[in-house]
Amino acid sequence: MAAHPPTRISIGFPGVVRNNRVLTAPHFGDEGWHDIPLAESLAKRLGGLPVRMINDAEVQGFAAIEGHGIEFVLTLGTGAGTALFRDGELMPHLELAHHPVSKNRAYDEYIGDAARMKAGNKRWNRRVEKIIGILASLVNYDKLWIGGGNAARLTFKLPANVAVVSNDAGIEGGARLWHPLSLRDTRQFPEATQRTGAFE
């Protein structure tokens, strides 16, 4: 760490993030987590290093996406995370985790980890398979990437345009977050306008 000190910081936050600010954080309890400039606060505490923060599913998506067409990310962990990309550009965040999906249960309550432990892995797999079909109709994605700690628990055959992402992908995604070619949405990060070549 001393030989290679950090120059930038990437944060994947489990909540709704916009312009480096936390809008809501349901898993932490919404009280006290409304419009919080978390990235700015961390930058000050970390010696002024530049900080970028987006939703954690979006960070994982940056590592997985191929940059063509509509790509959707579904993470299976404590809850259900989602991210949407179009031709490599991060689209506005869809917080489907708290949207009703079955018998007034939200995605979190239907395929989150608590639901998996209660329903059992076999039944939970059937639910995830159902969700894949729902997302295919809802988003009409070209590619669906499934990540998160519980992605390894999937036992059914995935459709040809669905793939599992390593749970460590967030590390690479955090690096890609700083590369101009991975940040076409310059409205979100205006400073990312200078192209420096292909990301490797």
What residue spans do the PLM features occupy?
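Glycine-rich phosphate-binding loop plus the immediately following alpha-helix
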Residues: 38-60, 90-130
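A short acidic Gly-Thr/Ser loop motif
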Residues: 75-79, 88, 149
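Short beta-strand scaffold segments in enzyme catalytic cores
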Residues: 15, 62, 80-86
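Adenine-nucleotide phosphate-binding core of ATP-dependent small-molecule kinases
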Residues: 1-5, 105-145, 149-200
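Short, acidic/turn-prone active-site loops that include or flank metal/cofactor-
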Residues: 77-80, 96-102, 167-173
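Glycine-rich phosphate-binding loop and adjoining helix at the ATP-binding site
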Residues: 2-10, 16-70, 110, 159-180
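Solvent-exposed alpha-helices and their adjacent loops that cap or buttress functional pockets
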Residues: 64-68, 73-76, 136-138
